[in-house]
Amino acid sequence: MKVISSIQELRDQLRGQNRAAFVPTMGNLHEGHLSLMRLARQHGDPVVASIFVNRLQFGPNEDFDKYPRTLQDDIEKLQKEGVYVLFAPSERDMYPEPQEYRVEPPHDLGDILEGEFRPGFFKGVCTVVMKLFSCAQPRVAVFGKKDYQQLMIVRRMVQQFALPIDIIPAETIRAEDGLALSSRNRYLSPDERAEAPVLYRTLHDVRDTVLGSDRASADLLAVEANAKESLARRGWKPDYVSIRKRVDLQAPTREEFLAGEPLVILTAAKLGATRLIDNLEI
């Protein structure tokens, strides 16, 4: 596996590779990331990964400086997965001058849910993903469904800019107790780690309530509020538990709900100092 930091060297290395499958990451790789590499191999060849902790998507009170950076360990994991190239640029490599041009998602998708609680987050995500796409020029890119809103935003960005890239969604990888794998799980204390699977169980409770209700009389807002209250009683600080349409992450109208519109439940909540996100399709 070649480890490359220069944009030009990456382009030179991939010249003529018109079926490359790309997996962008911020490093600190776990089994969830490695499953993305395996899925990428099913859809393209060679597999190209990137590791870059993108300052643009971190807010002023977020964990950019303490975000775990484990490059040597990550390299060993990617080598075992048969990744062809790892693009691991420095901040100077990616942004040799101030990044004055940004890619901003539409407000109806970028300023809701995560965007409401992390202003500017998706602008930073879209900007770096667009730049990474420009660097790697892949035919396929794989994004995990754990970051459901990010997946939707990247997919729409690719459509809007007519980029010749297929976006492949990857299922969330979970621990045996249901907790979605995340680099931030390492911040949990032992007691918090024992409590953390409650977030996924709460999503299942919401799904069971929705599926078991009479749709004509169901009150989705009340279901959401009850789920937040349940988490709060256990010591969580929930930002949202929200039932949305899968197609555009907007709240379903009563008519859409009655017609059986495919839905997804999304949540974000703090447990101690650690903010966890998860989702479950209905």
Curated annotation (Swiss-Prot):
Q: What is its main location?
A: cytoplasm
Cellular location of this protein?
Cytoplasm
Q: Where does beta-alanine bind?
A: Q57
Which parts of the sequence bind ATP?
26-33, 144-147, 173, 181-184
Which key words are in the record? Answer: ATP-binding, Cytoplasm, Ligase, Nucleotide-binding, Pantothenate biosynthesis
The chemistry this enzyme catalyses reads: (R)-pantoate + beta-alanine + ATP = (R)-pantothenate + AMP + diphosphate + H(+)
Which pathway is it part of?
Cofactor biosynthesis; (R)-pantothenate biosynthesis; (R)-pantothenate from (R)-pantoate and beta-alanine: step 1/1
Q: Which GO terms describe its molecular function?
A: ATP binding; pantoate-beta-alanine ligase activity
BP term (GO), one: pantothenate biosynthetic process
Q: Name one GO cellular component term.
A: cytosol
**InterPro entries per UniProt:** Cyt_trans-like, Pantoate_ligase, Pantoate_ligase_C, Rossmann-like_a/b/a_fold
Q: What Enzyme Commission number(s) does the record list for this chain?
A: 6.3.2.1
State the family it belongs to: Belongs to the pantothenate synthetase family.
Q: What is known about what this protein does? A: Catalyzes the condensation of pantoate with beta-alanine in an ATP-dependent reaction via a pantoyl-adenylate intermediate.
Q: Which PANTHER family match?
A: CYTIDYLATE KINASE/PANTOATE-BETA-ALANINE LIGASE, PANTOATE--BETA-ALANINE LIGASE
Q: What else is known?
A: The reaction proceeds by a bi uni uni bi ping pong mechanism.
* Subunit relationships: Homodimer.
> What name does UniProt use for this protein?
Pantothenate synthetase
